[in-house]
Amino acid sequence: MIICGFPGTGKSMMAKFSRWVDLESTPFKKNWLLYAEVAKHMSDNGYNVMISTHKEVLDALEQIEASYTVVIPPITDKATYLHRYDMRGNTYDFIRLLDENWERWINAIVEKPTALKTIVVLPKDGCVKAFADEFGKENR
């Protein structure tokens, strides 16, 4: 199972306390196709994988025909998430980037229909853990 989690939805925390893998994108140095291929390979081999929601990552998953679920916060929960980014120590530039692009990025995910993608909108103040546990059970 591949879950693409919007920033702040709890990917890293989930991986610390469960059998999910948080596949960090940084080592791939923007080689999004390789990142998607590694996630798909891990998923095909029984791992539950969480990755980022960068547009290029979602496009790469489509390119390799990998099924995936995107977990996003409610678009109205922006202030909660900006506070969450601050509390977890993200940089001012990161927080500003999310603040300036919040609506555009979430809308881009929702407005691009595809047969390979399932979208889950978290409840207010929610995190990916509750949904990831259920997704993982379905794919064992």
Ranges and model annotations:
Residues W20-D22, Y68-V70, K117-V120:
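Conserved beta-strand scaffold positions in the cores of enzyme catalytic domains, especially
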Residues S52, I64-Y85:
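Conserved phosphate-donor/acceptor-positioning beta-strand/loop module used by diverse small-molecule
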Residues M1-S18:
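Glycine-rich phosphate-binding P-loop
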Residues N90-R140:
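Small-molecule kinase domains that catalyze NTP-dependent phosphoryl transfer to phosphate-bearing small molecules
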Residues A15-M50, Y81:
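Conserved substrate/cofactor phosphate-moiety recognition/catalytic segment
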Residues G10-S12, E56-A60, K78:
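Short, well-ordered alpha-helical microsegments
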Residues I3-F6, L23-S25, V49-H54, I72-P74:
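Short His-Asn-centered micro-motif
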Residues K30-L33, D77-M87, F131:
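Short, charged, surface-exposed secondary-structure boundary motifs
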